[in-house]
């Protein structure tokens, strides 16, 4: 069985990690260092 605390930590970490990656990619895109030609 998965512990409720561990399950909560995982469910809380996944969105934060995705948000962090999105923000990092957005910052690179705004700097013009993106391969998308922005």
Curated annotation (Swiss-Prot):
It is found in: Cellular thylakoid membrane. One of its GO terms (biological process) is cytochrome complex assembly. The keyword Nucleotide-binding does not apply. Pfam families: PetG. It comes from the Bacteria. It is a single-pass membrane protein. The chain crosses the membrane at residues 5-25. Belongs to the PetG family. NCBIfam families: PRK00665.1. Component of the cytochrome b6-f complex, which mediates electron transfer between photosystem II (PSII) and photosystem I (PSI), cyclic electron flow around PSI, and state transitions. PetG is required for either the stability or assembly of the cytochrome b6-f complex. The 4 large subunits of the cytochrome b6-f complex are cytochrome b6, subunit IV (17 kDa polypeptide, PetD), cytochrome f and the Rieske protein, while the 4 small subunits are PetG, PetL, PetM and PetN. The complex functions as a dimer. This is Cytochrome b6-f complex subunit 5. It comes from Parasynechococcus marenigrum (strain WH8102).
């Amino acid at each position: 069985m998965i512990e409720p605390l561990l399950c909560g930590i995982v469910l809380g970490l996944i969105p934060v990690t995705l948000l962090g990656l999105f923000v990092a990619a957005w910052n690179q895109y705004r700097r013009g260092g993106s391969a998308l030609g922005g």
